[in-house]
Amino acid sequence: MASEISNRAEIDPRAKIGNNCKIYPFAYIEGDVVIGDDCVIYPFVSIMNGTRMGNGNTIYQNTVIGATPQDFDFEGATTETIIGNNNNIRENVVINRATNAGGQTVIGNENFLLEGAHVSHDTKIADKCVLGYGTKIAGDCEIGSNVVFSANVIVNAKARVGNAAFIKPGTNFRKDVPPFVVAGGTPVGYNGLNSVILD
């Protein structure tokens, strides 16, 4: 089925848009962008050069995907932002592309990024994660699958979070978090196992 694209959206003619997408008025899509099938792009979304998006994604108002990295080392290299399939990316989210030539910022499949989340350059998030309201993930982090970040979590640069970890609200951490643990506090401490996943 052909995509439904508002004539009030600003889309570079070089951008590749899949089938059965709906793009609302005032969306902004640059030329070096690929969007798969069955995606919904709401008003005032900006999708920048280097973004490669799979199928079934829904992007809400005022989100920016593929923004220039907030990194003093960035010198204009050609880099990418990879978004997988069936992600739900809510309002006011910012996802930065990578810093160095050939680099990628990656969001996998079936993730839920709530309002105001930020994913910085070169970070890689696997599948089925939740980023709570206002959660900020700094550059070069690695996040496993089925991780839940509660509201207003701050993940400092180069941290790694294992599969199915649960991070409590307001946690600020710079060290690695093992799989299947509940972590919280500043400084971060471990508060047991994620029994919801393990049961």
Annotate the PLM regions.
Residues P187, N191-D199:
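SDR active-site lid
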Residues S3-G184, V188:
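Structural signal for interior beta-strand "rungs" in well-ordered beta-sheet cores
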